[in-house]
């Protein structure tokens, strides 16, 4: 069984083809991705209407690219999967519409996939896939959650952000420092030149006793510190010396990473599990990986990540999630081609609503 996956939830258009071979893990045959970063840079963030229009332009050429790379044709597709949510409504509608039209034209069933489940299962595409059960840290621009994962579709929410996500804290802090979009990676690069102990910033909810996160207060603290530094020099934040900006970037990153790492260790301790899966765009952060590796090593915990190019939104994770749901019997594909999307869709609702 071959599953074509289409991802269009935000500002990346992704298409991939995976193959299910018996009971072993599905195999990625080919994938292609187009990022809209350059287009959105002029606006300092994602413009939903522009994102939707660009998905329309890219999705079919990417599909042709994937089929050519895999040596397959449209006739070889058995199921067409797409991101149903969460995400930008207009962007989701593009992927859903193309997938359902393609399924109807080919007479093949379709399957809507939860975007976060795609991230959650993306490490199964790596050379060192995890085994169930495990604790998962889902950390991206829009979501920060800790989950207990006992199998495909068997997810228990342990904790989540009560305000900003970690990726949002990276991005908004970067904007406060005058860094270009996308801010998170820019802040991390600048942080490599800085002293993480230069500024004392808060670690919200670090000692709360639960596994929830909060990053809004940290973002405010970064803003206050940046304005204070600028006022002391009678200038703008952007005019601050590069080393000062680097120190503030490093201090910001250190605060975010410390919270993520310590909460993850607490989750492992509370569940007595010995595997940690890290997924989502922030999972590519080198400082986060280094500290998680160190702390997990002390505890005899195996930590798994997606391949770096699969940390961002991509079609491979959508195809893989669909294939694993079908393979495990969690869900059947549908030959009903009327579709809807769910811009807001808690992962905890997945089993009940699928």
Swiss-Prot record:
GO annotation, biological process: tRNA threonylcarbamoyladenosine modification
MF (Gene Ontology): iron ion binding; N(6)-L-threonylcarbamoyladenine synthase activity
Binding site for Fe cation: 115, 119, 313
InterPro entries with a match to the protein in the record: ATPase_NBD, Gcp-like_dom, KAE1/TsaD, Peptidase_M22_CS, TsaD
Record key words, sorted: Acyltransferase, Cytoplasm, Iron, Metal-binding, Transferase, tRNA processing
UniProt subcellular location: Cytoplasm
Keyword Cytoplasm: yes
Keyword match Transferase: yes
Top EC class for this record: transferase
Cofactor comment text: Binds 1 Fe(2+) ion per subunit.
This enzyme's EC code(s): 2.3.1.234
One of the record's GO cellular component terms: cytoplasm
Catalytic activity reported: L-threonylcarbamoyladenylate + adenosine(37) in tRNA = N(6)-L-threonylcarbamoyladenosine(37) in tRNA + AMP + H(+)
Main localisation: cytoplasm
Family: Belongs to the KAE1 / TsaD family.
Function: Required for the formation of a threonylcarbamoyl group on adenosine at position 37 (t(6)A37) in tRNAs that read codons beginning with adenine. Is involved in the transfer of the threonylcarbamoyl moiety of threonylcarbamoyl-AMP (TC-AMP) to the N6 group of A37, together with TsaE and TsaB. TsaD likely plays a direct catalytic role in this reaction.
Protein name (record): tRNA N6-adenosine threonylcarbamoyltransferase
Natural source organism: Albidiferax ferrireducens (strain ATCC BAA-621 / DSM 15236 / T118)
Organism ancestry: Bacteria, Pseudomonadati, Pseudomonadota, Betaproteobacteria, Burkholderiales
Gene name of this polypeptide: tsaD
